[in-house]
Amino acid sequence: LFDFTKMSKNMGKCVMVSIAICLLMVAVKPSFSLAQLRPNGDISKTINLKVVPAQPPYVNVFLDMAPVNCPITPYIENGYTMVPIRALGESLGATIGWDSKNKVVTYSKGEVSLLVTIGTSTINTKDGKILSMPQPACLVNGTTMVPLRLFSEILGYDVAWDDNTRSVYISSPEEPVEIWGFYALGSLNYSSWQDLFGSNYPYTKSPCLAEDMEGIFAGWFFVQEDGTVTAEQNPTGFQKPSGWPSVILEAKRHDVEVYSMYFADHQHSNISAILEEQVLRGKLAKDISIMALEYDGVLIDFEGLGLDPSKADSDMRNFNAFLDELSGLLGDKPMGVAVHPLNSAYKGYDHEYIGQIADFIVLMAYGYEDMSIPTPTAPFDKVDEAVKMEIELVDPQKVILSIPAYGTLYVTAGDRTYLHSRPPAKDGDIKFSDNRVRQMHERGFVPQYLCNYLEWEDLQGRHQAFLEDAVSLKVRLNLTKRYGIKGAAIWRLGYITETVLAPVELVE
């Protein structure tokens, strides 16, 4: 974990990089069209980027404001920035090949096909053209390094340079993103209806989020300990809201699909025991198939399987058997399955098999926070690892990345540090009384965290907050382009800041 109170001595001023993040409406549903994170945008709103300066000759490289994991740290040689072509190319959705005999790298994406030969300053295209680079491609510990200008001048990506932190910011082209939302656990202050339809229930207004969403997962059903399903009031809060038919009708009017979502866990459902009993398991599958008749599809959200290592294999087998039964009963009705990521503590999910039997997987790549060590809920390294592990086993076009619209707030009092709360994105900065603050450190977006960091001290102790907002949510949504996956699902509607639909621009 970075300590920004110490790091600020070496950082100098926080960087404000000129990158525009625009969320554009698209003519054809269903998807958001996220404009590229474009350098040199018009001034609208400024935010701070908190970036640790790279030490010469090295440089930082960010794609759409998120880090790029490089096996060899990019560096400057003879005045030119050298970057690993495989790491950056694959992050941009290209296929990279290697001919070891001739020492030739192939770069392929869509209609673009390039041949780069180690030791030369030329590039061959598939149509026979020869292009020049300012610096020869080279091998460094088995990694091919090429001038960054290959991506900016030849491939046409927008690139910005920040001298204060020796950082390169690359913007990928605009592409549509398929967005889903969880319609669950709503309240007066955090209303799913208001986030989705733009006004207080039962009213709607335009523009609203529903105009650009593929669908919602209606978290209105809970599996009880006896294996029965209820949509009435229960301890988990997964229940039908009053006026729920209006949600379905209004969603249909906006061409938004509505999937019924069924939640279970160990604490409230003892889901492992239910799945282990063949009769209960079969009855549960039948009940869900009947309840799902009035919906466009089903999302199964059975959480906590395999937390006990001794039961991981049996949980996996039993869950597979349940999905088999349910899939047969549903017929042509689509079935999605929410899963914990492979790099989590929950090992009771057969990801490869689920990826085959389900129409899609919702990858819950968050919840990585520690209860006593200040950490964000979904930092880049964990999310990046989770998605890459998933698409090794599952078709990327079946993977929906679930992203959190909430952060984490920690308090340190004396020698005790604890997770205080998980503030929703729409709350903005943590509220505090100025006359109680002893020391305040500037809020800023940290690419490694994929969220904002804010720290202050008051009479209660030291506060460390990892906060989501419109910018961080858009950065997370853009990750779907990097991995070539189906789309993203926001947990949850009711937490989203209104400006997630508005253009936000970062200026120097």
Give the residues covered by each predicted segment.
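Conserved, mostly hydrophobic/aromatic
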Residues: I216, I300, I361, L401, ...
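Acidic/aromatic/glycine-rich contiguous surface patches that form carbohydrate-binding/processing clefts
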Residues: R476-E508
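Alpha-helical scaffolding within the catalytic cores
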Residues: F197-K205, S242-V247, K283-I288, P341-E352, ...
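Primary recognition of N-terminal secretory signal peptides and signal-anchoring hydrophobic helices
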Residues: G12, K29-V177, G181-S187, W193-E211
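Bacterial N-terminal signal peptides
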Residues: S18-A27
